[in-house]
């Protein structure tokens, strides 16, 4: 143990993308995790500090298109009121050259990449999924059009609050980043 302060940030967690060409074994997972830890530790040797910290956030009302969330709320399974809209929060912040954006649910790769494209910094870009909320899967609106025949779209949209979610997140982040 090296001591020090640790901070865990949930990354962009959505997407069913599995690595190809690597062993799916405990030994490989242990090797991969140990290698990542050693690399992270090496980065601390050249650390820098910054007093440049910025934070902004916005309350957002998302339209609720999935009645399942309302049923789960009425049954007491989800301890939250779901009406025609659901209120949440989105944040954007910087620490030095690093930028961070939050998504209030499980981020799809498309949402994460679109969010990173909004960030105009030269430093690292971080997407924090399931931040401030857990509004289910956040998928592209095209997933809600069943005529597109996107694999697993029926399941994915069944775990989402609705097709407007991704666009609202991106427009909110764009506003937060520009201000």
Q: Whereabouts are the PLM-identified features?
A:
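Non-catalytic substrate/cofactor recognition surfaces at enzyme active-site rims
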Residues: 1-179
């Amino acid at each position: 143990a090296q001591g020090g302060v640790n901070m865990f940030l949930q990354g962009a967690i959505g997407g069913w993308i599995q690595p190809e060409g690597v062993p799916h074994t405990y030994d490989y997972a242990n090797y991969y995790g140990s290698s990542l830890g050693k690399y992270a530790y090496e980065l601390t040797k050249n650390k820098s500090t910054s007093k440049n910290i910025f934070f902004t956030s916005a309350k957002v009302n998302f339209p609720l298109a999935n009645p399942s969330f309302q049923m789960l709320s009425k049954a007491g399974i989800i301890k939250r009121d779901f009406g025609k809209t659901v209120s949440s929060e989105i944040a954007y912040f910087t620490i030095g050259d690093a930028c961070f954006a939050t998504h209030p649910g499980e981020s799809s790769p498309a949402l994460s990449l679109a969010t990173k494209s909004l960030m105009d910094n030269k430093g690292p870009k971080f997407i924090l999924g399931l931040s401030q909320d857990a509004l289910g899967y956040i998928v592209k609106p095209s997933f809600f059009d069943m005529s597109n025949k996107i694999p697993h779209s029926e399941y994915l949209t069944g775990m989402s609050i609705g097709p407007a979610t991704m666009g609202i997140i991106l427009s909110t982040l764009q506003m937060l980043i520009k201000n």
